[in-house]
Amino acid sequence: MSSYPPHVIVLIGATASGKTELAIEIAEYFKTRIHNIDSRQIYKSMDIGTAKPSENQQKKIKHFLIDIEEPINPINVKQFQEIAQKSIQKEIKQNNLPLLVGGSGLYMNAITKGFFVPDVPPQNNLREQLEELGQKECWELLKNCDPISAKKINLADQIRTIRALEVFYVTGKPLSSQKVQKPPQWKILELGLNRDNLKERISRRTKNMFLSGIIEETKNLISRYGSDLPILETIGYREAKDVLNNNLPIDKAIELTNIKTNQFAKRQKTWFRNKNNPIWLNNKNLLKDAIIKIESFLD
């Protein structure tokens, strides 16, 4: 492939929608490789809980941006943006067609739309103080110092509220004034995967996750990095950790993980609807529809 501006294919969809399987079929057809845009699959030793592409799948098609760092060394959005864009540019220079696949809207848009995110590391002491104040008080503080960000952040969203306050207190500038958009010079086709039976797919994946060994994987992560590893607070690992601590029976852990995953999928779909404008694929024949749309885009 040789064209200017370079062509890039993006496949987005909620968790458990089948992105990995479809992406591999697309990559096989177009003889290309996959860039994995996922906020957890970038970490080593976290395979089951993140539904990472299997060893066989990775042998079949080369996947970039998987297993690039130890879980003890968190990668923020800005760092991931830089790593991913370099990897994608390398593919472009080799006249390959980059295929970006993921469900993390923030990470994907940072790459494809070029959002600049302030490079402010977590301020643990500040976060503890803000958490003690409570979410309602924190949101009121944010409304006073950064009203633009406050309008965009849900009153109940503690993580984003504290992050916006953190950036303000460290830099002295509102987060909203520091978000700059410098999109890469790519021509992008954004395809969307929206399954009708997503709840059933999530239920099957959740059960399979526990049958496949997420509890043992969590135990190994705790053994290597300690129980305070932040990423162990994410969906699936939090519940597995509670099982290990005898705070939760396995059946309740599966039930809770399923509920949280459905809630997460709902937020993903809302994000894609509000912040992206994908061409939604026909669920009756996903691969055929994707091929038709990509070939038309490349002509």
UniProtKB/Swiss-Prot annotation:
**Residues marked Interaction with substrate tRNA (site):** S104
Keyword list, A-Z: ATP-binding, Magnesium, Nucleotide-binding, Transferase, tRNA processing
Classification via InterPro entries = Dimethylallyltransferase, IPT, P-loop_NTPase
Its cofactor is: Mg(2+)
Q: Where does substrate bind?
A: T15, A16, S17, G18, K19, T20
Query: Segment Interaction with substrate tRNA: which positions?
Result: 38-41
Query: What EC number(s) would the UniProt record show?
Result: 2.5.1.75
- Superkingdom, according to UniProt? Bacteria
**Family designation:** Belongs to the IPP transferase family.
Q: What does this protein do?
A: Catalyzes the transfer of a dimethylallyl group onto the adenine at position 37 in tRNAs that read codons beginning with uridine, leading to the formation of N6-(dimethylallyl)adenosine (i(6)A).
Question: In its UniProt entry, what is this protein called?
Answer: tRNA dimethylallyltransferase
Ranked from the top, the taxonomy reads: Bacteria, Bacillati, Cyanobacteriota, Cyanophyceae, Synechococcales
